[in-house]
């Protein structure tokens, strides 16, 4: 089994893990847009890829998978997940399975507001969340919300 780890970056430990598990039954291929990726040192094969949002990224990966008989693709970077998920069928057409959730699930996980609504709509406890700072200030002013509060961007950390 040949495995391609995308956006491998500094995750050399993941490359080592897959090499150990695969043993002699396949190769670990890695790609990253930065040629200084430390993980390149540990892979069986390495390639510099276009950036994730580059229009050539998916065609590049599909062609690479086809040429190297890649069986599965696993991304090691959350930003890559949605891009790969939207193109799963194209990879399957060349015999490659992308190990990734469905796009709608990734969209919920990547968006704190969608995550909050999903949790609330499905009966889970979730901290109050607001889209606008004005809403928070108004709630504090009328005593419906008090400090401490946590303010985070909708996307990212």
Named regions from a protein language model:
Residues 106-157:
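Active-site nucleotide/adenylate-binding loops and adjacent lid/helix of ATP-dependent enzymes
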Residues 98-101, 152-153:
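Short beta-strands and strand-loop turn motifs
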Residues 74-84, 101-108, 130-137:
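Short, glycine/charge-rich beta-strand/loop segments that flank catalytic centers
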Residues 1-99:
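ATP-binding N-terminal substructure of ATP-dependent carboxylate-amine bond-forming enzymes
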